[in-house]
């Protein structure tokens, strides 16, 4: 629904996610994905589950999230949100994105995945996607000018 903004994170301000929910409710041949790093799910706990409205959570290991995902919900809060939605009947998509190489890469991601699937219902996961950091060259230049010390933006 939005490439540049986490709509669920600002749902309490603008209600765009709920508006999309109601827009798609009777359009069974159309699917919408709401991708988020937020845990702001309260509104969806009181709405009927729609198979064509996909709530997708982007996850990173806690240490990577703390370092690189400022002002987002913690990894454990996102997992808690997933669990709450699943308990209400929602199926979710899991997005491990962006995959970031660190010294403890295998350990961090293994522990994250083990914890995640020890807490949530794997049968209520639509799928799991894995992605790398990607952006246009022009936007990357702008981000590098604004974030001179970012490891992610200067990674080969």
Predicted regions: what they are:
Residues 12-15, 41-49, 105-113, 139-144:
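Distinct, well-ordered alpha-helical segments
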Residues 1-44, 49-80, 91-95, 125-131:
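Core AdoMet radical
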Residues 3, 10, 21, 71, ...:
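Sequence-level detector for tyrosine residue identity
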Residues 78-139:
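Conserved C-terminal portion of the radical SAM core fold
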Residues 141-156:
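Acidic, Ser/Thr-rich peripheral helices and adjacent loops at domain boundaries
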Residues 29, 121, 148-149:
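Residue-level recognition of short, structured coil/turn motifs
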């Amino acid at each position: 629904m939005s490439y540049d903004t986490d709509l669920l994170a600002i749902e309490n301000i603008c209600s765009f996610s709920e508006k999309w929910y109601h827009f798609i409710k009777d359009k069974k041949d159309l699917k919408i994905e709401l991708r988020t790093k937020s845990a702001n799910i309260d509104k969806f706990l009181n709405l009927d589950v729609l198979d064509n409205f996909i709530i997708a959570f982007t996850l990173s290991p806690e240490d990577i999230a703390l370092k690189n995902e400022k002002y987002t919900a913690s990894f454990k809060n996102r997992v808690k949100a997933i669990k709450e939605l699943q308990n209400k009947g929602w199926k979710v998509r899991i997005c491990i994105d962006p995959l970031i190489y660190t010294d403890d890469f295998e350990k961090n991601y293994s522990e994250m995945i083990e914890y995640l699937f020890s807490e949530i219902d794997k049968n209520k996961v639509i799928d799991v996607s894995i992605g790398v950091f990607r952006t246009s060259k022009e936007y990357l230049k702008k981000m590098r000018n604004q974030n001179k010390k970012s490891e992610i933006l200067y990674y080969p």
